[in-house]
Amino acid sequence: SGMIHPNMATMLAFVTTDVAIAPSLLQSLLRKLTEVTFNQITVDGDTSTNDMVLVLANGQAGNPPIEENTFAYKQFQKMLQTVLTTLAKAIAKDGEGATKLIEAETKGAPTDLAARMISKTIVGSPLVKTAIYGKDPNWGRILCAIGYSGQRIDPANVAIELAAIPVFAGGSPLDYDETLMEERLTASEVKINVILQ
C-alpha cells in the first residue's frame, strides 16, 4: 500500500455482515469507528483522493433490527471496531517499504480527539519511524512529535513507554535495560504509550 494517510477521501476496505440494522444507523456507526481506526493509520503521510471503507449488512441473521444504545448495538459496535482495527493495521503493515507496525496510544488527554491527534502525529513522524527501524529508543523524537501535535502539553506531565518499557517521565529520561529494549524493538510490531498527567 502507498498513499496511506486516510482522510476517507487509494485505500479500499470492505466488510460484510448478516445482521439486521438500519442503513442510517450503520452509516453513523461506521463514520464514528472510521475516525478511531482507518483515519488513525499512516504509511507515508500522503492522503489519497479515493479512500473508501464500505460495510454491507444484508439482515440475513434474522435478529431483531439493532437499535442505537442497546446491548445488541454495543456488542455489534465492539465487533465491528475489532474488524476495522484489524483491517486498518493490515493495510498499514502492507505499506510500501514498511518493516514494522508502530502503534501509539495516548491516555490522559483532555479529549479523545486530542489523544488521537497526538497518537497519529507520533506514528506519522519520519524521525520516530527511523528510530524504531534502527532499534533506537529515542524518546526525544517521540516527545518532539507530541510537542508539534497541535496539543498543549507540559513535558513535566508526560510519561512515555516504548515497547512496554518506561523511558521518560516527569520531564526526565529514565534508566532501562538496553538489552531488553533492543530485543523488543526487533519485533515486527512496536507500541508506544503516552500518558499525560
Protein language model features and the residues they cover:
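A structural signal for small-residue-enriched, beta-sheet-centric alpha/beta enzyme cores
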Residues: 1-197
